[in-house]
C-alpha cells in the first residue's frame, strides 16, 4: 500500500509539476511504478520481501520531492486548469485527490494493523 501511495504521488508529480500528459512517462518510469500504481495480482506477486523501512523510504523520497516542488509554486499555479482529452482539472483538485487517496488508504492500513497478531487495541 505504501508503494502504491508513492506511485500515485509520483505520477501526479509528473503530471502537475512537470506538465506531462497522463501516461506519457517513459518506459523506465512505467516499469518502476505501474505495478504498485495499479495493484491487483501483479502487485501481490511483485511487491513483497522488503522491510517496512524500504516502503517508508520510498514514500518519504517521493514526498520530499512533492514538498520541494510545492515550495516553488503559488496559488495561481494551484488554480491553473489543464485539459487532457475530455477531462479538465486544476492543480488544486488534482492534489486534493492525492490527499484523499492517501487518507482512504490510511484507513485501510489502520484497519489491517489492528488485525495483526499481537496488535494492541488503540481505539483510533
What name fits each language-model region?
Residues 1-38, 81-124:
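Short, contiguous alpha-helical
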Residues 35-78, 94-98:
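Acidic/histidine-rich alpha-helical segments that form the ligand environment
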